[in-house]
Amino acid sequence: MTTQLLDALTQIVLEFREERDWKQFHNPKDMALSLSLEAGEVMELMQWKNGPELEAHLTASKDRLGEELADVLGWVLLLAHDRGIDLADAFVKKIELNKKKYPVEKAKGSAKKYNEL
């Protein structure tokens, strides 16, 4: 994902918010809560389903899953923007940190947490 794409998506969600005069309600705490609630809706799509049933349900619910993931992304973009975070830069830096915490030679094929490797 390019920085230009992230910037364009951020502008879309900022315009949406501005047109509705909703910034007044968007403090960091409530934005984080909203992000979490939307992530909960992603999880709800998968709750109590496993294996082939989960795969079939996600295939049938692809549009809804996309909508819920888009809601999560919208809150991530707004929160990052409002807190002055360059999300592309933060993501690249975090991946570099994770590469150190999870070196391929220790982590490949393992679901263990970094402190258990």
Residue ranges and their predicted role:
Residues 1-117:
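Flexible "arm" and connector segments at domain edges
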